[in-house]
Amino acid sequence: MQTHNFLCIISVILGCSAQFYVIDDRIGLGREFDGIGGLSGGGATSRLLVNYEEPYRSQILDYLFKPNFGASLHILKVEIGGDAQTTDGTEPSHMHSKDEGNFFRGYEWWLMKEAKKRNPNIKLIGLPWAFPGWVGYGTQWPYFFPNVTANYVITWVMGAKQHHNLDIDYIGIWNEKAFDPTYIKVLRDALDRAGFTNIGIIAADGDWSIASAMLDDPYLNDAVEVIGVHYPGTNTVKEALLTERKLWSSEDYSTYNDDIGAGCWARILNQNYVNGKMTSTISWNVIASYYENLSFGRDGLMTAEEPWSGHYIVESPIWMTAHTTQFTQPGWFYLQTVGKLNHGGSYVALTDRKGNLTIIIETMTHEHSQCIRPPLPHFDVSPQIATFELKGSFAHLADLQVWYSKLDFKSGNGTLFKQLRPIRAHNGLLSLKLDVDEVFTITTVTTAQRGFYPEPPKSCPFPKNYTDDFTIDNPPFSEAPYFADQTGVFEYFRNTTDNSSHAFTLRQVVTERPVAWAKDADQTISIIGDYSWSDVNVSCDVFIETPKTGGVFLAARVDQGGESVRQAKGVFYWIYANGTYRVTNDIGGKRVLAEGLSGTKAGVWYTLTLSVKGYFATGSLNGFPLWKNAAVLEPKSGWAALGTLSFEYAQFDNFNVIAG
């Protein structure tokens, strides 16, 4: 290793015009460090990850969770699926109805196991964004019957243990929605009675308002172990400090994962503690593994959105994470001697109380560290020399390891997580020449590594000719590859009433509106393919299960999903159980392009074919033209999709799409 030309080692007699910062444990320690984490869900943000083939899927997981390799995350937080749209898709509930339970739906169980496989000490958190409709008894409020909601959540905790041998460490309340003190206390009591006294409650995963309620209600204060706030801008409030509870930024970042996103992440990882005394920061999301044209595309620590090609990108936020995670562990303590640098930037120091010391320094500039929210007040950062004086139990330290990153916005040739030559402290003093947009880790820890795998396959678009007949005996996941549910839940289904051509199908299984988090559509929909597709031929066998009122659709050029799914436009070809069809320009059916009689009914398989080319669309039923040349002025492109008229059972088979 070469000596970095920005490293400056001085002694007392050198007389540099440096600013001095004391690192000392004699005045006592600060708060206990709880770890850095990532969030899968809220929603469906890891949807495409599961469909990667090996070895690429395992490589991605190593970059996220393997200790001393990449991000080396200490915490994994997952959505407790609630059958509803929760940002980039729906995640299935373990209980679609109160009378059933299935602990193998979705992929969060799998992801938690993969994280634990790599790091047995990783902390696990579950948080609901939405709830199946039965929990709300037909309302949009999950707190009317707090015992029902608490038991629903505890069933998920028990399923994690009994079916996957996963011990959940923390449970949340209702993401970014109103909290209910009665429910929180009922949940605490129910957890204790079920034997989960070790599981802590995080509340309320929104703003700081719960802190005042906790000060007014000692029983609520006792029930909550962690105050979790979202996007705090690195600041806390007096009431939260007065509770004497752990303070976490339990969802943060949510920023496009280029170098500015890396600057945002590096800054808040330090300053959430320096300014706000928050001892954990969790990134939404852990990995951008969903169609990029959905909400908040690429707002993850790394990107894996092409399972069909195997391509993924280890983005710079991974290495900003490593500057903290590879040199600390939950259970370490911040020192009281942390703070801001005189010419901009910040530093934190942590110890394991066994002689190890880690100092993390960041000098991110305002323009190069803006997160998606909240707005960032102006501040200045300039080059500087910072001298750290090691005192107390650290005074004897001589050689310390140095890891360095530089986000170079001028040349574009930055440095990410590079190990430099050790720095030697002289008489307890060590100095660094700091430029802007840099991160240094100075540490006694010697186990860090910059993990590396060979380049993954090159990026390529979704296949232009794609077919799925959904025939699989023991599917590893409940969803078919690449389909991304945006309202409702579409699962592999073994059709015991048809052992011939439709024995294996894809079935929509949510039959009542969930207690929603976002504005789900009134129709169910699952998208697939390439957002740039314009001229498309889509076909699928469909089976309406609801007599008289049921209906299904096949669609092309679908231009919206996520939280905007209600506004989705495209070409939607519907058939109904009442013997009619419609072609609409939107999912809500407000703009009708064609309509008429189809002779369709429930309980019969039909083959729908939708062809869209240029400004015209044509549809057939069982191979015979049903309508043609419907004028389509917009949208110009979008995904293919399938779905149902309402929250109802329906089946799909032999899906095929050919893009021009």
Curated annotation (Swiss-Prot):
Its EC number is 3.2.1.46. GO terms for cellular component: lysosome; membrane. InterPro entries: Aldolase_TIM, GH59_C, GH59_cat, Glyco_hydro_59, Glyco_hydro_59_dom, Glycoside_hydrolase_SF. Glycans are attached at residues 147, 293, 356, 413, 465, 495, 499, 537, 578. The keyword Signal applies. Disulfide bonds join 264-371. It catalyses: a beta-D-galactosyl-(1<->1')-N-acylsphing-4-enine + H2O = an N-acylsphing-4-enine + D-galactose; beta-D-galactosyl-(1<->1)-sphing-4-enine + H2O = sphing-4-enine + D-galactose; a D-galactosylceramide + H2O = an N-acyl-sphingoid base + D-galactose. It is an enzyme of class 3 (hydrolase). One of its GO terms (biological process) is galactosylceramide catabolic process. GO terms for molecular function: galactosylceramidase activity. It is found in: Lysosome. SUPFAM superfamilies: (Trans)glycosidases. Substrate binds at residues 87, 129, 175, 373. Its main location: other. This is Galactocerebrosidase. It comes from Danio rerio. The gene is galc.
